[in-house]
Design a protein with these regions (language model features):
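Active-site gating/metal-coordination segments in enzymes
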Residues: 3-4, 12-105
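Conserved, mostly hydrophobic/aromatic
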Residues: 25, 57, 65, 90, ...
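N-terminal cationic-hydrophobic initiation segments that often serve targeting/anchoring roles
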Residues: 29-33, 58, 124-125, 150-151, ...
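Mid-to-C-terminal alpha-helical segments outside catalytic/metal-binding sites
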Residues: 1-4, 52, 174-175, 179-186, ...
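Short beta-strand segments
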Residues: 6-9, 41, 133-136, 160-162, ...
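Short, surface-exposed alpha-helical segments at coil->helix boundaries
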Residues: 19-23, 117, 144, 197
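Catalytic pocket-lining loop regions of alpha/beta-barrel enzymes
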Residues: 63-64, 69, 77-186
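Structured beta->alpha junctions
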Residues: 42, 46, 165, 191-192
Length: 225
């Protein structure tokens, strides 16, 4: 059973729509504080308005930023000037930033985007001290952690498992555990697109300790950092 969930917003382009989404998540988290942890959805391209919205969300209980969707939000992950205010605040508040990852190969699907492992790595290089969660296994960036320089720069990077069922064979859990370890993997679903039980079923070959790390220990550690 899922006792508590992190609820993310979408990568919105319209700030008024983002506010509606953020308000909904914040409201529900106050009604069900033992069940919901809200994140705040912004677009750094909004400049000061983005920062004002982020600061408001943090005051009202948001515990992270995301999901950012670089393709849909026309966000250049190498534009440090645009990204730095958000990342500086996130770093000072010790909150994670969640970014959509896109596989550079394979089938197309709605929302896939073009935030490839290369773009995500460039972003991480700019902000290595930030806590960063790469959605959908970072589009495969975790496989490059076999390279020493990628592993070193990705010390504060986590990979979430959202939509695993649509992207990879279940054995990715075992392979990812061997590559980066269960302490760098965070349980995600993209619910209701994929159910939590379906993802959990695909983790059955892992040890109970690894499953505990992925499902709750890692995020607990992030929030207590």
């Amino acid at each position: 059973n899922i006792r508590k969930s992190i609820v993310l917003g979408y990568g919105w382009n319209n700030i008024e729509v983002a506010k509606i989404s953020n308000n909904y998540n914040l409201k529900k988290s106050k009604l069900f504080p033992e069940r919901i942890i809200p994140f705040c959805s912004i677009n750094p391209n909004w400049g000061n308005k983005a920062m004002q919205e982020l600061e408001r969300c943090l005051r009202e209980g948001a515990r992270g930023i995301g999901e950012l969707h670089p393709t849909n939000q026309f966000l250049d992950l190498k534009n440090k000037k645009i990204l730095e205010p958000m990342m500086t605040l996130a770093r000072s508040e010790k909150i994670p930033v969640t970014i959509h990852g896109s596989e550079p190969v394979g089938h197309k699907y709605p929302g896939k985007g073009k935030s490839s492992p290369k773009e995500l790595f460039d972003f991480i290089e700019l902000f290595p001290d930030n806590i960063i969660i790469l959605a959908h296994w970072g589009g495969g960036l975790l496989f490059y952690e076999l390279m020493k320089e990628v592993k070193k720069i990705s010390e504060n990077v986590f990979y979430d498992t959202a939509t695993t069922s649509f992207l990879y064979e279940p054995k990715i859990f075992k392979i990812a555990n061997e590559l980066v370890g269960s302490k760098k993997i965070i349980f995600g679903t993209d619910y209701p697109l994929v159910s939590s039980q379906r993802i959990l079923n695909e983790m059955k070959e892992l040890t109970q300790e690894d499953i505990k790390n992925i499902t709750y220990k890692n995020v607990t550690s992030i929030f207590n950092s």
